[in-house]
Amino acid sequence: MDTKVIQIGDRKIGGGNPIAIQSMTNTKTEDVKATVEQILRLEKAGCEIIRCTVPTLEAAAAIREIKKQIHIPLVADIHFDYRMALAAIENGADKIRINPGNIGSTERVKAVVDAAKERNIPIRVGVNSGSLEKPLIEKYGGVTAEGIVESALDKVHMIEDLGYDNLVISIKSSDVLMCVKAHELLAGKTVYPLHVGITESGTVNSGNIKSAIGLSLILSQGIGDTIRVSLTGDPVEEIKSAKLILRTLGLRKGGIEVVSCPTCGRTQINLIDLATRVEKLVEDYPLDIKVAVMGCVVNGPGEAKEADLGVAGGIGEGLLIKHGEIIKKLPEDQLLPALKEELDHWS
């Protein structure tokens, strides 16, 4: 889907730019030290845009100091009180996220739009299924994809009527199929970049599955310019999942893909532990390769040869395979160090 280019800090989204990975801090924003520490961890994991909640003037004031210590654009998340938006903009937020429907009167929305316009920072218009207006619920006989889209476009038109079009849209639902349908409907009705995610998707286990299904169905249609995998847990897990989803869909390169067999009665090494340790090992390598971890000598060598680098287990030992060729036979406890050495000197 062709969308217009929007600048968020030093990051461009839309218009064919790479899909940006976002997350949101779960610290108290006014706790600058804790918030910065978390953002730096997220940056290291691959986060490209960060959102922070701004429920108080203290949180808004903290944005100025936080931005001095981080390296990615910061989005201020605003609900209900338009003064928080004004303060966040004043303190250097790179983008603000609002739902004009809960900000208050048109005059208050205009004040926010005017402040954003003065600094030329984008506004993300966010609508969730849980905040759908009663008239739209009555019109469509419940919370529906059609109602979510109409709500979002109404708010976009409100801001356009105030003379501003530096906008991003997000429409979210915890209902995966409703969320997918809403994005399909919206994509044909707007040129603004879309921030995509399944809201309130759950814990790392359930949330990853729901997000992978929903985001894949949306992104595979060419819809979406930024994404967030919303999880109940450490936000760093959101980044890991988002990167894997994009890589799996062929929308992003870089980062090592680990494949491993599901184990069976033929498994001859502690494969579950080894595969887990390999996944942890490769997190910080920027290599665009595939690493295979296989548990037995029946299928292991053949399947590992399809990867760039791999191990195939035997009884207390294993084979190290590179570019399809067996290069070493090692005791089990030496497989991981040998794998690391190959990665450190990859060619």
Q: For the regions a protein language model found, what residue spans apply to each?
A:
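N-terminal amphipathic alpha-helix/helix-capping segment at the start of soluble metabolic enzymes
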Residues: 1-24, 117, 280
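Active-site mouth loops of central-metabolism enzymes
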Residues: 16-34, 53, 72-80, 136-149, ...
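Hydrophobic faces of well-ordered beta-strands that scaffold small-molecule active sites
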Residues: 19-25, 50-52, 74-78, 96-98, ...
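Glycine-rich, proline-tolerant flexible connector loops at the mouths of alpha/beta enzymes
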Residues: 26, 31-32, 43-66, 97-105, ...
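Alpha-helix-loop-beta-strand connector modules within alpha/beta enzyme cores
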Residues: 57-78, 111-123, 183-194, 278-280
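Glycine-enriched alpha-helix->loop->beta-strand junction motifs that scaffold or abut catalytic
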Residues: 70-72, 90-96, 117-120, 187-193, ...
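Hydrophobic or amphipathic alpha-helical targeting/insertion segments
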Residues: 83-124
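Catalytic alpha/beta core domains of metabolic enzymes, predominantly
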Residues: 128, 136-282
